[in-house]
Amino acid sequence: MRKILVTNALPYANGDLHLGHMLGYIQSDIWVRFQKLQGNQCIFVCGSDTHGTPIMLKAKSLGITPEELVTKYSNRHLQDFTDFEINFDNYHSTHNSLNKEIVEDIYNKLNNKNLISKKAIAQAYDPEAKMFLPDRFVKGTCPKCKAEDQYGDSCEVCGATYDPTELINPRSVISGQSPIQKNSEHFFFDLPALEKNIKDWIESNTLLQPEVANKLAEWFEQGLQSWDISRDAPYFGFAIPGTNEQKFFYVWLDAPMGYIASFKDYCNKNNINFGDFWGDSSSESELYHFIGKDIIYFHALFWPAILSSTGYKTPTSVFANGFLTVNGKKMSKSRGTFIQARTYLDNLEPSYLRYYFASRLTSRIDDIDLNLEEFVTKSNSDIVGKVVNIASRCAGFIYKKFDATLSGEIFDPELESEFSKNHDAITQAFEKREFAHAVRLIMALADKANQFIDYHKPWQLAKEEGQEQKVHQVCSQGINMFKVLIAYLKPIIPSIVAETERFLNIQFISWADAPKFLINHKIDKFKPLATRIEKEKVDKILEDTKKMFENEQAPQSKKEEPKLDIAAECTFDDFMKVDLRIAKITEASHVEGADKLLKLILDLGGVTKQVFAGIKSAYKPEDLIGKHTIMVANLAPRKMKFGMSEGMVLAAGDGKGIYILEPHEGAQPGMRVK
């Protein structure tokens, strides 16, 4: 039995949760439920992130205390999580005495190791509001990539971190005025001194996502900087000892320690030994942090450095998820797609969204698009039309004609074996967080089950004399195949599974038992387990969202939507002159003397081509080998000083990143793209 501790990023307690938040929490909840079904001791903790200037100022504007504000939103968050079937073992808060003790203890350990220093810095100060401005209360143009409207600590476009003083055309979010520079003594954590610790952690981390590893390599190349861990009063948070409450710990120092506090609180309540899960590096337990891709910097640099230097076990891995778009675009209040968790729950069951997200989630850091039309179609087709429909087609015969008892014989052992054989592949897919692949495997089995029922037509057999035994066996096999499918789906749609357990008079408590058929087993009367989503309900979610935000006043003038610079039109015949082929990357290597190029050897199904691709900044050669991509196969060879380039691989980019195109699973080298 494995000992596994899982955390999820702490939601900030100054506003309601939206569906973009739920993407990450649903992902981790599915994985945790799977681990528990495997029989592992898996503990899942979270809590509210409750400190910082945004909370202080919002509470002031509402005429309440910060404590009242965070209590209000913490309760609302927990209710949203509960109703979305996110099953935390403990939900805590960063604003409590336990977390304060942990923060001060870790700070003192860092200070005793001379990893904390003080220095005067020029800081943004709002002369109108008469206060120093936290990083997130200064906005301007990113000094690295020149993206506009970025926060004062990091860029959401390129991921760069910087000081607010480096922003181009900065402005105060509070007053809109240009901040002035004012000196203040701050406390710094010596991150560069722990570079080896971080690199050792990365090298030992076999589960780190390639995108995270690439980003870390980029940050190392830029050079690590000491981290400002303090903020000036007024501030809602924990005061730094010895500063007479004039300096406070930066929220990003005490927030991750909320993971420790939440788990310690769980241990205290349940008589668990904290060290068994989160002791030192010698512990055999596993520790995983599920986070959004926008906070990789804090979790994959600062956090391992702090833990490794204060005697705590470092994460076994950090798993990041992408952002959520709706109908192919960024979530929008005006379009009604900035959907809050509660707005969804007021109109639809959580199972549908949990299933849709699972059908899209992989181990990669890909953004997920919630296409609402596809969401309706997929939910109705897969959950209702494929899975639940199996039970509804068979249960009535068993209940009415055969005393609600399943057959003692298996009608089609070969088909039963196929459902069992897929167990290992589905298990591996769940373990590796390849939920989309797991769903595809499960739905392929659902198709086979429906084909079986369509072929034997029990509703016709029931009308024929002497076919009672066959009807019994066919419908029993149908119910058993349904049972296996539902057992496989338990981590994804737990509430539908709970209703199924009532219907089947069984509890799915062991993943190993998932593929086992029930023999001579008594079932209950079937009741509908899921109903089709009506488009009107989705429309109502959009309308409710629009109404919620229609009176909001935008603090700044509305920006124009970005326009695509589409190339001149070409004819179909022109397009067909370009021969696009599926290619497998069999070799990839650096090109000596080239800053941007990688040398690729591509297999087109028996034919190989050599290509020099300008993707070095985005990919390591070893990460590309074995991938499938798309290439222009009939591009005239081009002689370069490094050798002959015999084509071009396709990649997308916006000037800030490069992303090679990968075909859908099943595409083979040499296939033409049309």
UniProtKB/Swiss-Prot annotation:
Residue positions of motif 'HIGH' region: 11-21
Chain location of the short sequence motif 'KMSKS' region per the record: 330-334
Organism annotation: Francisella tularensis subsp. holarctica (strain LVS)
UniProtKB keywords: Aminoacyl-tRNA synthetase, ATP-binding, Cytoplasm, Ligase, Metal-binding, Nucleotide-binding, Protein biosynthesis, RNA-binding, tRNA-binding, Zinc
Protein name, per record: Methionine--tRNA ligase
Cofactor(s) this protein cannot do without: Zn(2+)
Subunit composition and interactions: Homodimer.
Protein encoded by which gene: metG
One function term, GO molecular function aspect: tRNA binding
